Amino acid sequence: MFNFINSLKNYSQESFRAARYIGQGFIVTLNHINRSAITVQYPYEKLITSERFRGRIHFEFDKCIVCEVCVRVCPINLPVVDWNFQQDIRKKKLKNYSIDFGVCIFCGNCVEYCPTNCLSMTEEYELSVYDRHELNYDQIALGRLPFNSFQDALVTKAS
């Protein structure tokens, strides 16, 4: 008889505890109903990037002095710099400069240590392509100014 009463007592205590936990979860859910949505509808809304955002690297061909500091400070030796030494003026002449963004870790060391500021980080983060070889940008692609998506009339800013 006492065994039945103890089991009934334990059952009622566990039922009350379960109902209390369900009630607590329901209260948390009700508290979040009035909050605004965090999700951004990506193609139609874009996030405003911060001032120090590290996006695609912009390269200015005319400012580069071919010092190769960017290659030395890169943790993965990523920038490929091709140059010729011109005997008549005794200077290096830049032939080709390329960065593979499929491998780049966007650390920003190349931008930080460049003595002539020919490298800069842009706010462009949409680098998705179907073929990974298209992420190898040469000096022409790196010199292209980034497209500001907020100038598009169909895109709204997400705050």
Swiss-Prot record:
Residues given in the record as [4Fe-4S] cluster 2 binding sites: C74, C104, C107, C110
Positions of the 4Fe-4S ferredoxin-type domain: 55-84, 95-124
Membrane topology reported for the UniProt record: Peripheral membrane protein
One GO location term (cellular component): chloroplast thylakoid membrane
Superkingdom of this protein's organism: Eukaryota
Catalysed reactions, semicolon-separated: a plastoquinone + NADH + (n+1) H(+)(in) = a plastoquinol + NAD(+) + n H(+)(out); a plastoquinone + NADPH + (n+1) H(+)(in) = a plastoquinol + NADP(+) + n H(+)(out)
Main location: plastid
Compartments it resides in: Plastid, Chloroplast thylakoid membrane
Cofactor note (record): Binds 2 [4Fe-4S] clusters per subunit.
Record-level GO BP terms: photosynthesis, light reaction
E.C. designation(s): 7.1.1.-
Binding residues annotated for [4Fe-4S] cluster 1, in chain numbering: C64, C67, C70, C114
SUPFAM superfamilies: 4Fe-4S ferredoxins
Keyword line: 4Fe-4S, Chloroplast, Iron, Iron-sulfur, Membrane, Metal-binding, NAD, NADP, Plastid, Plastoquinone, Quinone, Repeat, Thylakoid, Translocase
Cofactor(s) annotated in UniProt: [4Fe-4S] cluster
GO MF terms, alphabetically ordered: 4 iron, 4 sulfur cluster binding; iron ion binding; NADH dehydrogenase (ubiquinone) activity; quinone binding
Function, as annotated: NDH shuttles electrons from NAD(P)H:plastoquinone, via FMN and iron-sulfur (Fe-S) centers, to quinones in the photosynthetic chain and possibly in a chloroplast respiratory chain. The immediate electron acceptor for the enzyme in this species is believed to be plastoquinone. Couples the redox reaction to proton translocation, and thus conserves the redox energy in a proton gradient.
Oligomer and partners: NDH is composed of at least 16 different subunits, 5 of which are encoded in the nucleus.
Family, as annotated: Belongs to the complex I 23 kDa subunit family.
Protein name: NAD(P)H-quinone oxidoreductase subunit I, chloroplastic
Organism field: Chara vulgaris
